[in-house]
Design a protein with these regions (language model features):
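Aromatic-lined carbohydrate-binding surfaces of glycoside hydrolases
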Residues: 1-135, 167-168
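Conserved alpha/beta catalytic core and glycan-binding cleft of carbohydrate-active enzymes
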Residues: 139-169
């Protein structure tokens, strides 16, 4: 995880202040809360260098030329600490600029970046701002997922992998 799903990291005393939601560690632990409230605060200048450092450490552990930054389920992006910035620039802009920075970092390090596509569905035209080598891992929540999201990503010309599942995440 590099954006949302950072419960373990953002629940620590060391990095808790980088969480989008103030005092998220006070929320009772549950399957839902561990996802919903643990998005990194993109308006904090310490966030991106920390995540890049973590990615650099993880990259060394794998021989694959692909690296999944995840970047899914950023439920609280722009709702708390980065709210003012989101009002100025838009939540989709905050999302794509952050993902673009991480993707470029991976490209510079010889990796093909991948990310989960559930957030980009809302603004598929932003795929054009990402590196051409970027792979959208397209998946959905519904047992009978619609084709609309897949079609929208395909129309941008971006590479996507369809990732079917039956609540296996």
């Amino acid at each position: 995880a590099s954006f949302g799903h950072l419960c373990t990291l953002l629940s620590t005393k060391t990095y808790g202040d980088l969480c989008e939601m103030e005092d998220s560690w006070k929320e009772p632990f549950s399957f839902w809360n561990r996802m919903r409230y643990h998005t990194i605060n993109v308006s904090d200048e310490r966030s991106l260098p920390l995540i890049k450092k973590m990615i650099a450490e993880y990259m060394q552990l794998f021989s694959s030329n692909k690296f999944n930054i995840c970047a899914d389920e950023t439920f609280c992006l722009g709702k708390y600490k980065s709210k003012k910035l989101a009002e100025e620039r838009g939540v989709h802009r905050l999302y794509i600029d952050y993902v673009k920075e991480l993707a470029q970092f991976l490209v510079e390090n010889g990796k093909i970046p991948m990310f989960w596509g559930d957030i980009i569905w809302n603004s598929p035209e932003l795929m054009k701002e990402l590196p051409e080598s970027m792979i959208c891992l397209n998946w959905g929540y519904a047992p009978e997922q619609r084709e609309d999201e897949t079609r929208a990503i395909a129309q941008t010309g971006a590479v996507q992998y369809l990732c079917p599942g039956v609540c296996g995440w």
